[in-house]
Amino acid sequence: YRDQTADELRDALKRAEADPAIRVAVLTGAGRAFGSGYDLSTLAPGEVPELERVLEVHFNPLVREMRASRLPIVTQVNGPCAGAAVGIALAGDVIIAARSAYFYEPFVGIALVPDAGNALFRPRLVGRGRATPAMLLGDRLSAEEALAWGMVWRVVDDAMLADETDAVAARLAERTPGAVAATKRLIVAATDNGMGEQLDLERDLQGEAGRTPEMKAAIAAFLARRKG
């Protein structure tokens, strides 16, 4: 993901919300992955990323827009989902994953902290006991494991993912729009209490982490691997 990606997603969602004929939104990835997290390859050698600004201006507004949208958002996780993409996926209302998909949060491994709502949504979905070691150790979580943990609603064979998503989206579109929007609002109000403060805290701590020597070394190692 790049800054532009988050901005384009938010703009697309706003356009959909403004069209009364649209009753549901589907979010998926282009290509093999759902999302690979923030694109560190955009950084120059030795550059210190302004992660507070990245989150405040680009990614946190997207998460807020998704949760506040009148539209039910179906997240179609079509492949690997890493870093900030996990938070964006979990910000959806109905999450359907391909059987080959997995979820991966490498933040701590590169001297960063979870962001884009990760530290809010994942503990509330799976519980602190499962979320804490998963985030600290950065182990990959398969789609089947995510289903068992309650992170996703349904897992389907890769070949059936598009058809299943379309069928669910069609069912949602048949519902009364006002009732759907009000129900989503009730659920978000019940589960996202303190989301604004949480996103702000993620932003601040990520900014601090992004200025540490460990993070600089992690970025240098990543860029070196890319060149190699």
Write out the residue ranges for each language-model feature.
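Terminal low-complexity tails and localization/encapsulation signals of metabolic enzymes
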Residues: 220-228
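Short, hydrophobic secondary-structure boundary micro-motifs
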Residues: 25, 54, 180-182, 195-199, ...
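Short, charged, surface-exposed hinge/linker loops at domain edges
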Residues: 184-193
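Glycine- (often His-adjacent) and acidic-residue-rich active-site loop
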Residues: 1, 29-65, 81, 109, ...
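Terminal peptide-recognition signature
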Residues: 8-9, 27, 39, 72, ...
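Conserved CoA-thioester-binding segment of acyl-CoA-metabolizing enzymes
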Residues: 1-28, 46, 64
